[in-house]
Amino acid sequence: MKILVVDDSEAFRRVMTELLLRAGYREVTEAGGFDEALEAYSRDHPEIVFVDMVLPGRSGVDLTKEIMSADPKAKIIAMSSVINKAMIRQSLEAGAKDFLLKPTNELALSSVLTLWSG
């Protein structure tokens, strides 16, 4: 399964990639921002995309809308270290399938992947 991790924090992307590799996912791509993420999505067609909702420039909500308009079947999991009802609502309204609190752990990541990988 191809997975794309979008986050402006290189350290967080490395942690996510390591967790995914340890869980057996071998095709993990990383992107640090909006444009890089769109390019990676178009090129790799990942089955699941983890998107930080707070990105520099255009937001993760904007990215989610953009991906969903190009591919309505996309499976996007919103992520943020800031949890509030408005952000969760905006993420889900934009098309995200789920919301994951950062930093995450193997159990939470595994649960989300099991739920949305089918």
Question: PLM features: residue spans?
Answer:
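Two-component/phosphorelay signaling modules centered on CheY-like receiver
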Residues: 10-29
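Acidic, metal-coordinating helix/loop segments flanking the phosphotransfer/catalytic sites
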Residues: 30-48
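Acidic catalytic/metal-coordinating carboxylates
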Residues: 33, 59-62
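Active-site residues of response regulator receiver
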Residues: 52
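The feature encodes the CheY-like receiver
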Residues: 56, 84
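C-terminal output helix
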Residues: 86, 104-113
